[in-house]
């Protein structure tokens, strides 16, 4: 019985080769793009045009959606399009990622509404651009940080559970640190709080993506988190952070975060390495040829 012929090596070139051989440089390049993408002054343009919040949200939606094309282009150039599909046993991964969605839903002002401490008043004509705006934030930021930065960090660390953990933490730390850019709008201690919870939501989105193997689960978690988080600021009146709301939000978040961490260490998510084309680092002197 003859042995099957070995697969031919596929030549690695272009941006995929850069991602694998100059990972740090590629991470830096993507972060620079992220800084530019989140700094587009669409709000100032809306004000200059004499529009209100609706125009600002429409411009934000259009701007962020268009800018999302670049990180999605990079996903294909890095040969990581597998993250737009799912891994084996993804159904179990969906169940394991449910705590991430609970964390996001916990960001809605549900308790103050039930207790009568706050009200949300929003017309349909206002909610449509708000809904699309929140979606575009999740699409842009997740395609950059979970679609590009996170897998690049997976290249940078060993291909094992510890390396995966470091990649989750490192990419989420970069995502959190990006929010320091808000200091250019004026110093506020709230910015540092935003950095902290952005790091945590980054970890949450990364785990949802790991469990399912699919980038759009991270987008969905981020979208839901922002949809609830900005709702009161845009359309609410009354008191948001009541004692009851703080307690419920904290307890639910801690329990769900604990479950996510437990699932991460219990579940074998190594299938994403092959699914997302995350190979071992090239040995010294490699000519850019992939493994068999």
Language model feature labels by segment:
Residues 1-20:
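Short, Lys/Arg-rich, polar N-terminal cytosolic tail immediately upstream
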Residues 38, 191-248:
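Functionally important transmembrane alpha-helices
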Residues 76-82, 105-118:
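Transmembrane alpha-helix boundary signature
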